[in-house]
Curated annotation (Swiss-Prot):
The keyword Heme does not apply. GO terms for cellular component: cytoplasm. It catalyses: a ribonucleoside 5'-phosphate + H2O = a ribonucleoside + phosphate. This is 5'-nucleotidase SurE.
């Protein structure tokens, strides 16, 4: 008999977000884990790894519209959610894995440094639990559910197949196809150099104070685009390692990364990763 996994779900778009609902729905279809949600009560995008250092946060058990094992809403950031889940709710029996997302928009390239979705995953990793951050390019409506249960299961099992902390987490971005073409597959790549940039937009100037919006951002790309960006444009799912031996990915050699790519390709193309649950 295979052991069912215990998976903690979180995000930065809020517990009621469409991306969370899609993640839950497709994990339920895959049917290999018991799901627990601890997510922000409200939108927390752009929070990175910030946490509520100077003020208390609350956590409340809520009824979730899908059949999960339990769900809680937190008044703080994505990192607050992970801290409360691992340090209080599940401190006596930690989850096997933390999945964060599915984010409404890209977290490819340097956007990862702003991302609350990725911040939650990093907090889990630093706390000793493997984690994956998921994001959908452009808009959550581009997410394709046809093969999603299999993809989510394989990525989860792959994350657990690596001896912690040799390779302890991933940042995954799903491509957006303008013609709704099916994803071509998955590729392990390094973080791209592209980033979101925009000028502050003045909303109100009352003579004493000015109010700005910082949300008007566009992706900045060089002519020499990164492997991550090119892979997404070619309609492949990108899988980027977050930490290798608790060190930034940039510190490992090209040869070592090629070995990681080969191991990833072999695992994903194998018939099943079910033996990991024995």
């Amino acid at each position: 008999m295979h052991r069912r996994l215990k998976i903690l779900l979180t995000n930065d778009d809020g517990i009621s977000a469409k991306g969370m609902s899609l993640l839950v729905a497709n994990l339920l279809k895959a049917d290999f884990a018991d799901l627990y949600i601890v997510a922000p009560a409200t939108e927390q995008s752009g929070k990175s790894m910030s946490f509520s250092y100077t003020q208390p946060v609350s956590i409340e058990k809520v009824d979730y519209p899908q059949p999960v094992a339990g769900a809680w809403a937190v008044s703080g950031s994505p990192v607050d959610c992970v801290k409360l889940a691992l340090g209080d709710l599940f401190r006596n029996a930690l989850p096997d894995l933390v999945l964060s997302g599915i984010n409404h928009g890209s977290n490819a390239g340097r956007n990862i440094f702003y991302s609350g979705t990725a911040g939650a995953a990093m907090e889990a990793i630093l706390s000793g639990v493997p984690s994956i951050a998921f994001s959908q390019e452009q808009h959550i409506s581009f997410f394709q559910e046809v093969h999603a249960p299999e993809i989510l299961k394989k990525l989860s099992l792959y994350a657990l197949s690596m001896p912690f902390p040799i390779l302890s987490g991933f940042n995954v971005n799903f491509p957006a196809s303008e013609r709704n073409e099916e994803w071509k597959g998955m590729r392990l790549v390094t973080t791209g150099k592209e980033y979101a940039c925009g000028m502050p937009k003045l909303l109100v100037d009352d003579g004493k104070r000015k109010f700005f919006s910082l949300s008007d951002c566009q992706i900045v790309m060089d002519e020499d685009i990164s492997d991550e960006c090119r892979t997404l444009l070619e309609n492949y799912i990108t899988v980027v390692p977050l930490l290798v031996r608790n060190s930034p990915l940039a510190l490992i050699s090209e040869t070592k990364f090629q070995q990681l790519q080969e191991a990833f390709d072999n695992f994903i193309s194998s018939a099943s990763g079910a033996t990991l649950l024995d």
